[in-house]
């Protein structure tokens, strides 16, 4: 097992090195970009914030919450996840399925990071998001795309098998990954359509063309990279592996 682990780690490092020959836009990790660049400008003092699906690992930490005097509500389908969150991070918790939750329209900001791919009814989730936001409120969403090859494989393989494979190849995913995924309507085009349907305006977007799922074997990684380059040339942003969106609920005077 030690030898296999060494080979996997070597292939991962070699795959990362090969990536350096690609233009920068193909090397920016979407989740890291969401954390470091996309979401922070929206964090201003005094907001009522909802973290949807963050559970035990909310987007905000206690220092940021305290410094900005934020009120944080955690919404998750699993009460156990909410209970494992850092003590005092949530001012309130709601155990509910975001696909069928009716909000109070009191949120200035909603953060939903790598959650909607696990929701069976994303149309319902968009309705819930619109209901949680107050007029002028914003939703910040990061999601893997249904069009990604790993997403297609995820949909084909039995849950128990893909969970074992994922955890065997990438042990760090044992915490926080491995939940069932459906990728319902999780594409840039579908998200824009759903936003319009639920009276939300797309304010900002970013599209990302990298992931690490195939980096455990360099030849496979090279083939996947060639696929990404070709797919992007033909389909543009629909070829994104992951993407971020900021959605605004129009103010009452604009409705």
Pin down the residues of each PLM region.
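Active-site micro-motifs of SAM-dependent methyltransferase domains
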Residues: 100, 117, 148
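Active-site acidic short loop of glycosyltransferases
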Residues: 104-107, 121, 135
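A short beta-strand submotif of the Rossmann-like class I SAM-dependent methyltransferase core
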Residues: 112-115
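Conserved N-terminal segment of class I S-adenosyl-L-methionine
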Residues: 1-105, 109, 240-243, 251-255
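S-adenosyl-L-methionine-dependent methyltransferase catalytic module, highlighting the catalytic core
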Residues: 120-128, 138-252
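Basic phosphate/pyrophosphate-binding loop/patch that engages nucleotide-derived ligands
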Residues: 131
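Short glycine-centered segments of the SAM/dcSAM-binding site in methyltransferase folds
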Residues: 48, 136-138
């Amino acid at each position: 097992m030690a030898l296999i682990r060494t080979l996997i780690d070597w292939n991962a490092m070699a795959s990362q090195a090969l990536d350096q020959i690609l233009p920068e836009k193909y090397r920016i990790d979407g989740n890291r970009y969401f954390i470091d660049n996309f979401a922070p400008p929206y964090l201003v003092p005094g907001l009522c914030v909802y973290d949807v699906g963050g559970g035990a690992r909310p987007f905000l930490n206690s220092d940021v919450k305290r410094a900005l005097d934020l009120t944080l509500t955690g919404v998750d389908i699993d009460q156990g996840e909410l209970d494992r969150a850092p003590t005092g991070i949530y001012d309130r918790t709601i155990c509910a399925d975001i696909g069928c939750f009716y909000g109070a329209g009191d949120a200035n900001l909603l953060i939903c990071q790598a959650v909607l791919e696990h929701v069976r009814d994303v149309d319902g989730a968009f309705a819930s998001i619109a209901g949680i936001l107050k007029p002028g409120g914003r939703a910040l969403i990061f999601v893997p795309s249904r069009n990604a090859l790993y997403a297609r494989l995820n949909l084909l393989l039995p849950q128990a098998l893909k969970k074992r494979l994922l955890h065997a190849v990438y042990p760090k995913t044992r915490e926080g990954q491995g939940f069932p995924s459906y990728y319902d309507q999780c594409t840039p085009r579908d998200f824009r359509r759903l936003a319009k349907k639920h009276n939300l305006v797309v304010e900002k977007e970013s599209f990302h063309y990298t992931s690490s799922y195939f980096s455990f074997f360099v030849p496979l990684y090279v083939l996947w990279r060639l696929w990404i380059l070709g797919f992007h040339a033909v389909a543009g942003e629909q070829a994104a592996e992951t993407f971020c969106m900021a959605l605004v609920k129009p103010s009452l005077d604009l409705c």
